[in-house]
From Swiss-Prot:
This is Transcriptional repressor NrdR. The lineage of its organism: Bacteria, Bacillati, Bacillota, Bacilli, Lactobacillales. PANTHER family: TRANSCRIPTIONAL REPRESSOR NRDR. Negatively regulates transcription of bacterial ribonucleotide reductase nrd genes and operons by binding to NrdR-boxes. Keywords: ATP-binding, DNA-binding, Metal-binding, Nucleotide-binding, Repressor, Transcription, Transcription regulation, Zinc, Zinc-finger. GO terms for molecular function: ATP binding; DNA binding; zinc ion binding. Residues 49-139 form the ATP-cone domain. Binds 1 zinc ion. PROSITE patterns: ATP_CONE. The keyword Acyltransferase does not apply. Its cofactor is Zn(2+).
Length: 171
């Protein structure tokens, strides 16, 4: 490691410890030439993930951009910031687990919508209306009907969490 003071290429590590989140190693170093002490940080370099946009342009995956879209769709809804960041974490983990260097923005949008559908229906519809660019009211209504059908299927399946006995009719 080159000394920032005298530019000598030799240094020794005096102290090494992980940071609070454990993702970065902080190292105190001392120059072998002039004795100047300095700090370096070592972290795993994430492979850049490129998003292929609808127009074919490519840009680096941006967590903040995904989060902004979710925040906009959940505006004035009972969805916590923690939940929204959790969605972004889940989407990013899912995308990175595919092992690809490039992914289409459509796939990312679908992953976000899968998550939002289970969290808040209004946020889901808002996100879908921007993401899918509904051309007219009929396309919008079709999306609502699909959502209502999914709800019916969910309601028809008995929940494993149900522990109480069904209510009996009074005679």
């Amino acid at each position: 490691m080159q000394c920032p003071h005298c530019h000598h290429n030799g240094s020794r590590v005096v102290d090494s410890r992980p940071t609070d989140d454990g993702r970065v190693i902080r190292r105190r170093r001392e120059c072998e030439n002039c004795g100047f002490r300095f700090t370096t940080f070592e972290r795993v370099e994430a492979t850049p993930l490129l998003v292929i946009k609808k127009n074919g342009a490519r840009e680096e995956f941006n967590r903040e951009k995904v989060l902004r879209g979710i925040i906009r769709s959940a505006e004035k809804r009972p969805v916590s910031m923690e939940t929204m960041t959790g969605v972004v974490d889940d989407v990013e983990n899912k995308v990175r687990s595919l092992g690809e260097n490039e992914i289409s923005s459509q796939v990312i949008g679908e992953y976000v919508m899968e998550q939002l559908a289970d969290i808040d229906e209004i946020s889901y519809i808002r996100f879908a209306s921007v993401y899918r660019q509904f051309k007219d009211m009929h396309v919008f209504l079709n999306e609502l009907q699909d959502m209502m059908e999914r709800d019916k299927v969910k309601l028809a399946k008995p929940s494993a969490k149900t522990t109480h006995a069904p209510k009996r009719k009074k005679d």
